[in-house]
Amino acid sequence: MELIIISGRSGAGKSVALRALEDMGYYCVDNLPINLLPELADILSTSQQSAAVSLDIRNLPHSPETLDTLLQQLADAQHQVRIIFLEADRSTLIRRYSDSRRLHPLSMQDLSLEAAIEAEAGYLEPLLQNAELVINTSEISTHELAQRLREFLKGKPDKELKIVVESFGFKYGLPLDADYVFDVRFLPNPHWNPDLRPMTGLDQPVIDFLGKYSEVNNFIYSTRNYLETWLPMLEQNNRSYLTIAIGCTGGKHRSVYIAQQLGEYFQAKGKKVKIQHKSLEKHHKKNSA
């Protein structure tokens, strides 16, 4: 199995890095006692799950030889261990600690902040020497750090954005998870056709009814183009999910049809898309009760 060890200076961004790896699908453990690493790797190897563990000054062995022995033990068990070391300039670390008002782990030894930063560098030297990747976070944002990690681990700069396209009814309230909300209540309403009223936007007669209106087709086309314009930037911006909500009055006809059309379009483009119809689920539960 693949085991990523995130280590480095306190205040250099290990927690940010661990969250980024969690978004990439790694099983993440923060500050695991180092003697438990082989046991964790053995347990997770049965499910073929990759893992990431953060190690800092608090859970490192006192002897460099102990670290070497553990790494060799993992290698002998056919685990792929990769060490990523996060560094930052002394002035940057001092500023970050000043801004956060947190104590450095070595401050408990009655060291000043500058002395603690200096002492920590010596303790971490064995990990630095074994690191496959060293990143200085002094001048980069959290998004840039996450992107560098993706490039290193996955071989590509952008992770796959998961898109959720959902329909809803305004009378049930706005969906709390929506990033974008599009109101389609101004479009022709099949509800006023007695034959179409019991149907939904997934039924062919409703599809034919809405598909004949140019304003419906123009709305789908314009919304599709808008999303296609900005999707590349959203994919680069360290997002895991994008939720697009389409709403009409009851969430039964217009919003269902348009959400389905948009979702299927982006699926055909190779995007990872989930289509869901929130208010249809309410109608179904109501009718089956």
From Swiss-Prot:
Belongs to the RapZ-like family. Displays ATPase and GTPase activities. GTP binds at residues 56-59. The keyword RNA-binding does not apply. GO terms for molecular function: ATP binding; GTP binding. Keywords: ATP-binding, GTP-binding, Nucleotide-binding. This is Nucleotide-binding protein MS1718. It comes from Mannheimia succiniciproducens (strain KCTC 0769BP / MBEL55E). PANTHER family: RNASE ADAPTER PROTEIN RAPZ. InterPro entries: P-loop_NTPase (IPR027417), RapZ-like (IPR005337), RapZ-like_N (IPR053930), RapZ_C (IPR053931). NCBIfam families: PRK05416.1. It comes from the Bacteria.
